[in-house]
A protein has these predicted regions:
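Select transmembrane alpha-helical segments in multipass membrane proteins
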Residues: 2-15, 47-53, 113-121, 202-219, ...
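Helix-loop-helix connectors at the membrane interface of multi-pass transporters/channels
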Residues: 24-48, 143-144, 224-251
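Membrane-water interface regions at transmembrane-helix termini and the short interhelical loops
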Residues: 57-78, 144-147, 257-269, 286-297
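Hydrophobic, small-residue-rich membrane helices and short re-entrant helix-turn-helix hairpins
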Residues: 66-77, 115, 138-167, 185-197, ...
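Selective recognition of specific alpha-helical transmembrane segments in multi-pass small-molecule
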Residues: 81-93, 157-183, 253, 257
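Hydrophobic alpha-helical segments and their helix-loop junctions in multi-pass secondary transporters
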Residues: 83-110, 128-129, 140, 177-180, ...
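TM-loop-TM module centered on a large, flexible mid-protein loop between adjacent transmembrane helices
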Residues: 171-221, 273
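Conserved small/polar residues in nucleotide/adenosyl-binding loops
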Residues: 308-309
Length: 309
């Protein structure tokens, strides 16, 4: 009963989460082409963005069309590389802070009642929506490993989710610290992509910006592969194979490629209404799933909760 209810919600979330690929890639392209614009005059930013995103999404499609090896691509290769390069940048920044945290004044929006503005800003991380989408991939990978017992699958998903949550929390905390400390060096940036580029350039120069570009490349690559795979698998099952997994993967990759060329700031602005619409139901579904045992996962509870949001 529970599965029959959340399946459409997960499908919708997967579709919206696929748009997160383009948003994350906006960060990637902003960082990469900030670096390129300072060191090369032979490319315009628009052309460089087009060429780079084309190559990037070619890799995304290559890996997405081989979902059986996704644990190798992401778990054993891409994730460790991302964590290594990210750690190099963060350690360099923390060892020589630009300003003490206590000396940094909050922006006007966060001076009073900061919880709700921060919550809305947090929508942009796509974590809740991506969690719904990635859950499909995680369960599918576990089953391909020969695990078919639902209880064991649930335990594996819970443990992997808990570990992921801890790592993400750590990454967010150190990123916040580095960002706050950088206020002693730079004015408030238009977006996080610009801020990261400035921080990397300050502490490590051109090498730092190169490390940052590599770090964000791997971060976005693993996210994009997971999102495209989740979206393609979901819609393949929905259509009963009438439009193949391969076709859906190509479609979602092409869609993300097109959107990624709009630019980071524009993507963020366009995504806000969508996030405001989809995030409350996503949070409600996740919360109800955790407390569902207390009302027997009654379908009517889910329906009424979503109606009243």
């Amino acid at each position: 009963m529970f599965n029959s209810l959340i399946s459409p919600a997960i499908t919708l979330s997967s579709f919206i989460a696929c748009m997160a690929t383009a948003i994350v890639l906006g960060v990637l392209t902003s960082l990469v082409f900030s670096f390129r614009s300072r060191h090369s005059s032979s490319f315009t930013l628009a052309l460089a963005l087009l060429l780079f995103s084309a190559v990037f999404f070619a890799f995304v499609l290559f890996f997405s069309l081989r979902p059986g090896k996704i644990t190798v691509w992401i778990g054993k290769i891409i994730n460790p590389l991302f964590l290594f390069f990210f750690a190099v940048l963060i350690i360099a920044a923390l060892l020589s802070p630009g300003a003490a945290i206590s000396s940094v004044e909050p922006t006007e929006a966060y001076q009073n009642g900061s919880f709700f503005p921060a919550l809305i800003e947090g929508y942009g991380t796509m974590d809740a929506i991506a969690g719904l989408a990635f859950g499909i991939v995680v369960i599918d990978v576990i089953r391909r490993m020969g695990v078919n017992n639902d209880d064991i699958i649930a335990e594996d998903v819970l443990s992997s989710g808990f570990l992921t949550g801890l790592l993400m929390a750590l990454i967010y905390v150190v990123s916040i610290l580095v960002g706050a400390q950088s206020r002693g060096l730079f004015e408030l940036s238009e977006n996080g992509g610009v801020a990261l580029t400035q921080i990397a350039g300050h502490y490590l120069g051109g090498v730092g910006q190169l490390i940052l570009a590599v770090t964000i490349t791997f971060a976005c690559l693993k996210t994009s592969i997971g999102l495209v795979t989740a979206c393609a698998e979901t819609f393949d099952k929905m259509t009963g194979g009438k439009f193949s997994y391969r076709g859906w993967a190509i479609l979602f990759t092409a869609f993300s490629f097109a959107v990624s060329n709009v630019g980071l700031s524009a993507i963020i602005n366009y995504s806000i209404p969508v996030l405001m619409l989809i995030y409350p139901p996503a949070i409600a579904l996740i919360t109800l799933a955790f407390i569902g045992r207390f009302f027997g996962h009654d379908r009517i509870v889910y329906i009424l909760s979503l109606i009243h949001i």
